[in-house]
């Protein structure tokens, strides 16, 4: 959430930001509500001052007529204060609701654009494999290797669910252990987070659990949701707390299941493991001071690049355009892995790294206390370490040979115990 005073003092910039983010929000209405709130606060303070003066007068020696007048004045002031307080709560609630519809401000380097097709490629790492045969996609490879059962998932749970089996299970566990060890060695504290969060916490992180376009599963009648990412549970971990500046940055690695409706997702690129309703993900999350957030954002992206380089997966980095940013993100990079099983081969998103500045911290009231005892909002950042289902796609499709065998990256062999996957189904 943006600071009210910042909005009031930067109306044109906020309006332009809403425009480039392709968001519908009435900035003028927000400013009007803010001005009303400021006026009401001033009036309320004046009424409270008058009430206190009247109370002091009541303590002095008064004749009956003067005391009766003070009593009437006190009663009238009490009624006016109660009315002003009710009105202030009403205006404050309207202001909060309207302001929460605003996205974060946008970094100057973020390209303008409306969708992921407008994202800007900034680098490539690794060389896509050059096959002498027509590469299979991960769905066909998984069938040959007998490591994923999509049909059983559909029968038991519905479309976009699946069973991992045999070496597929061991490969997922190997990726998890590789990722946890990698991050722990670099100062991250591992977490295994809940799969359910309160609706208020989900909203506080900037996710919308309601509406037809929401990707969040809500639990009927409980005001709780299945988490779509450990960003929710790690971001809410310090809600309402004041941290010590000397304890920052705090680096967390959260392992969780992720549940997503994937409303409206369709097409060949949504096939198989790419868009599913449940998957496992290892998420990086950071709390830091405002002065550290841009450098820490670069570090999260660098760690993602290290992970995918170690996994021998060719990838590119893109700067996400303004129209494709989620509301909390100030700046965001995506890593896209080469997926040769797509017709002709193409890039598919496998990670993101977002700097959300103090947008989420204001909504969840997460602050830190500096050396002078002053309190400030922290900056909060997140980045995908490993979205397991999508990593499996890239591993299978890039590591395949003409016979359907798949070579396992050396970084994973100590964790899974095998160097190749072999076909079981002819």
From Swiss-Prot:
Q: Which GO terms describe its molecular function?
A: ATP binding; serine-tRNA ligase activity
Question: What biological-process GO terms show up in the record?
Answer: selenocysteine biosynthetic process; seryl-tRNA aminoacylation
Entry EC number(s): 6.1.1.11
Give me the reactions it catalyses.
Answer: tRNA(Ser) + L-serine + ATP = L-seryl-tRNA(Ser) + AMP + diphosphate + H(+); tRNA(Sec) + L-serine + ATP = L-seryl-tRNA(Sec) + AMP + diphosphate + H(+)
Report residues binding L-serine. 229-231, 283, 384
**Localization, UniProt:** Cytoplasm
Its EC top class is ligase
Q: What is its main location?
A: cytoplasm
Which amino acids does the record list as binding ATP? 260-262, 276, 349-352
Q: Which family does it belong to?
A: Belongs to the class-II aminoacyl-tRNA synthetase family. Type-1 seryl-tRNA synthetase subfamily.
What does the function comment of this entry state?
Catalyzes the attachment of serine to tRNA(Ser). Is also able to aminoacylate tRNA(Sec) with serine, to form the misacylated tRNA L-seryl-tRNA(Sec), which will be further converted into selenocysteinyl-tRNA(Sec).
Which comment does the entry carry about domains? Consists of two distinct domains, a catalytic core and a N-terminal extension that is involved in tRNA binding.
PANTHER family, sorted: SERYL-TRNA SYNTHETASE
Under the subunit heading, UniProt states: Homodimer. The tRNA molecule binds across the dimer.
Mind telling me what this protein is named? Serine--tRNA ligase
Q: From which organism does this entry originate? A: Treponema pallidum (strain Nichols)
């Amino acid at each position: 959430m943006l600071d009210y005073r910042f909005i009031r003092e930067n109306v044109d910039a906020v309006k332009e930001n809403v425009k480039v983010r392709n968001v519908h929000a009435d900035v003028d209405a927000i400013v009007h509500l803010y001005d009303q709130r400021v006026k009401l606060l001033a009036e309320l303070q004046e009424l409270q001052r008058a009430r206190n003066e009247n109370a002091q007068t009541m303590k002095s020696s008064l004749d009956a007529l003067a005391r009766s007048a003070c009593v009437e004045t006190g009663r009238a002031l009490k009624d006016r204060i109660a009315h002003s307080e009710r009105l202030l709560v009403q205006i404050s609630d309207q202001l909060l609701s309207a302001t929460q519809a605003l996205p974060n401000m946008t970094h100057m380097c973020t390209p303008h654009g409306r969708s992921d097709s407008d994202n800007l490629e900034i680098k490539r790492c690794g060389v896509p494999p050059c096959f002498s045969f027509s590469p299979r996609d991960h769905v066909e490879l998984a069938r040959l290797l007998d490591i994923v059962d999509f049909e059983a998932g559909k029968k038991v749970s519905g479309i976009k669910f699946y069973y991992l089996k045999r070496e597929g299970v061991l490969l997922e566990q190997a990726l998890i252990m590789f990722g946890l060890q990698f991050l722990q060695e670099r100062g991250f504290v591992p977490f295994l987070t809940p799969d359910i969060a309160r609706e208020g916490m989900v909203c506080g992180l900037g996710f919308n659990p309601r509406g037809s376009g929401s990707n969040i599963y809500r639990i009927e009648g409980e005001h709780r949701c299945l988490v779509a990412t450990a960003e929710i549970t790690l971001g809410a971990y310090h809600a309402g707390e004041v941290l010590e500046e000397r304890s920052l940055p705090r680096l967390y690695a959260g392992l969780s299941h992720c549940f997503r409706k994937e409303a409206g997702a369709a097409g060949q690129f949504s096939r198989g493991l790419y868009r599913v309703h449940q998957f496992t993900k290892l998420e990086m999350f950071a709390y830091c001071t405002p002065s550290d957030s841009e450098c820490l954002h670069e570090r999260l992206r660098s760690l993602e690049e290290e992970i995918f380089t170690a996994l021998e997966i060719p990838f590119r980095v893109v700067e996400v355009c303004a129209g494709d940013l989620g509301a909390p993100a100030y700046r965001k990079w995506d890593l896209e892995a080469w997926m040769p099983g797509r017709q002709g081969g193409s890039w598919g998103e496998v990670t993101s790294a977002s700097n959300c500045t103090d947008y989420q911290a204001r909504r969840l009231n997460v602050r830190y206390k500096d050396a002078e005892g002053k309190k400030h909002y922290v900056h909060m950042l997140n980045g995908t370490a490993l979205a397991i289902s999508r990593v499996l796609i890239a591993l299978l499709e890039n590591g395949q040979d003409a016979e359907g065998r798949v070579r396992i990256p050396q970084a994973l062999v100590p964790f899974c115990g095998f160097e190749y996957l072999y076909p079981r189904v002819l």
